[in-house]
């Protein structure tokens, strides 16, 4: 048994939204907290992944799916006698690509926490906009060592990668050339 065709089609509209909402939340509210910024971003990536898995699972259970894909569009911009439409379309190929894009986005978000040295001290000679150069720490014996330092623009990275994830997911579910490039 699978979910209704209409439910899954409506769900496709919501798959790209969590990352763009995460972008807005990080930029406007959580950018001072590194933990909150990556938590918001990873949670958004997880929600998109969950939606994509529901769509993918339902897509592979539909007989003759290529003949009746999940599709929906709305009138967006009037152009005289016609309308430019925006919409979503999930056929067998886009269901597969959606599966891989959502999975890859989630893995990149998770990997990025460690890659940016989360949990390490802030560098004592790092500058915003430049890569981290390390922090000087003193051990129990009084010896000074340079260790990896956390990325100075950590929250900004998660905001921008969330915006990128929104773009990738929108590209996969778009039903026409206009929304493919928007």
Task: Outline where the language-model segments fall.
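Alpha-helical transmembrane segments of multipass membrane proteins
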Residues: 24-28, 166-173
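Transmembrane helix-loop-helix hairpins at membrane boundaries of multipass inner-membrane proteins
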Residues: 2-11, 29-159
